[in-house]
C-alpha cells in the first residue's frame, strides 16, 4: 500500500517537474538577479560591490518615504472605493427589478473594466485637461469661473487624487461582479425568515449579507491590494509621477531610477523592498485561500 502510494506521488511529481523547472527559470532566477544587483553599484561599464549600502541610502532618502506613503494612499484609496462602489452597485443589481433593465445596467457598468489601464489613463488625460470635459462641465453648472481652469494633472494637490479616481473608475466592476455573484449564492430562505421576525433592512445587511460575503470580501480586497500596489500604467500614462514627484508611486520611481538615472543597483533595492511588501500580502492571501479549501 505504501509502495503504491509512493509510486503515485513520484508519478505526480514527475508531471509537475517540467512546470516547476520553467517556473523557477521565469521567476526565481530573475528575482535572484534583482537581489544580487541590489548589492552592487552598477553602471554601464562595471559593477562594484557595496553590500547593503543601496538599502541604507534608500532608507535615509526622504523621497523614498514620500513615494511609499503616496503608494499606500493610492492603494488604500482605490481599494476602499472599489469595495464601497462595488458593494453598492451589486446590491442595486441584486434587487428585484425588471430583468432587461438589470441586464442592461450590468452590461453598461462593466464597460470600464474592459479598458486596458493605458487606454483608460489616456481617456482620463483628455477628460482632465484644462479644456477637457470635466472643466467644461463645472463651468456649465456654475461651479467654475469661465475665465479659470483647473489643471487637475498639473497640480501637486490634485494629481494623485486624479490618478486614484481613474483607477477607481476602471476597476470597480471587478468588485461589483464578484460581490453580485456572492449575493446570488445566499439562500433566499434566510432573508424570508428574517422578514418574518421583523428584522430591519440594515440588520439583514449587517448580520446576514456581510457575514455571508466575508470570504469573498477578504479575498478580493487582498487581491486588489496586491494589484493596485504594483500598478504602473495609470501613474506613468497620466502624470509620469509629477508634478515634482507628487503622484510618484513605487513602480514608477523604480522605472525612472533604473532607466533614466541608470541607478540599477539602487532601483533593484527599491524593487526588493516592494517585493517583500507584496510577498507579505501574497502570503496572507494564500493562507486565506488554503483555509477556505481545507
Language-model segment annotations:
Residues 1-3:
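N-terminal hydrophobic targeting signals that begin at the initiator methionine
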Residues 5-294:
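A structural signal for multi-pass alpha-helical bundles of membrane permease subunits
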Amino acid at each position: 500500500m505504501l509502495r503504491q502510494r509512493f509510486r503515485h506521488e513520484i508519478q505526480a511529481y514527475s508531471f509537475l517537474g517540467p512546470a516547476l523547472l520553467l517556473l523557477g527559470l521565469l521567476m526565481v532566477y530573475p528575482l535572484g538577479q534583482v537581489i544580487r544587483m541590489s548589492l552592487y553599484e552598477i553602471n554601464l561599464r562595471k559593477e562594484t560591490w557595496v553590500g547593503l549600502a543601496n538599502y541604507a541610502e534608500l532608507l535615509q532618502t526622504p523621497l523614498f518615504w514620500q513615494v511609499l506613503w503616496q503608494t499606500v494612499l493610492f492603494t488604500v484609496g482605490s481599494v476602499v472605493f472599489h469595495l464601497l462602489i462595488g458593494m453598492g452597485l451589486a446590491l442595486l443589481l441584486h434587487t428585484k427589478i425588471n430583468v432587461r433593465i438589470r441586464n442592461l445596467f450590468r452590461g453598461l457598468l462593466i464597460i470600464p473594466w474592459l479598458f486596458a489601464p493605458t487606454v483608460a489613463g489616456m481617456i482620463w488625460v483628455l477628460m482632465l485637461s484644462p479644456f477637457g470635459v470635466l472643466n467644461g462641465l463645472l463651468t456649465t453648472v456654475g461651479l467654475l469661473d469661465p475665465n479659470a481652469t483647473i489643471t487637475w494633472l498639473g497640480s501637486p494637490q490634485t494629481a494623485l487624487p486624479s490618478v486614484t479616481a481613474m483607477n477607481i473608475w476602471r476597476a470597480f466592476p471587478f468588485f461589483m461582479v464578484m460581490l453580485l455573484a456572492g449575493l446570488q449564492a445566499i439562500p433566499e430562505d434566510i432573508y424570508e425568515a428574517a422578514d418574518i421576525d421583523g428584522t430591519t433592512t440594515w440588520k439583514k445587511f449587517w448580520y446576514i449579507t456581510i457575514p455571508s460575503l466575508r470570504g469573498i470580501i477578504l479575498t478580493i480586497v487582498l487581491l486588489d491590494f496586491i494589484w493596485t500596489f504594483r500598478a504602473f500604467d495609470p501613474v506613468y500614462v497620466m502624470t509620469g509621477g509629477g508634478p515634482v514627484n507628487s503622484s510618484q508611486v513605487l513602480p514608477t520611481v523604480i522605472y525612472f531610477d533604473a532607466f533614466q538615472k541608470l541607478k540599477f543597483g539602487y532601483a533593484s533595492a527599491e524593487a526588493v523592498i516592494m517585493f517583500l511588501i507584496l510577498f507579505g500580502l501574497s502570503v496572507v492571501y494564500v493562507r486565506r485561500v488554503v483555509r477556505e479549501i481545507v
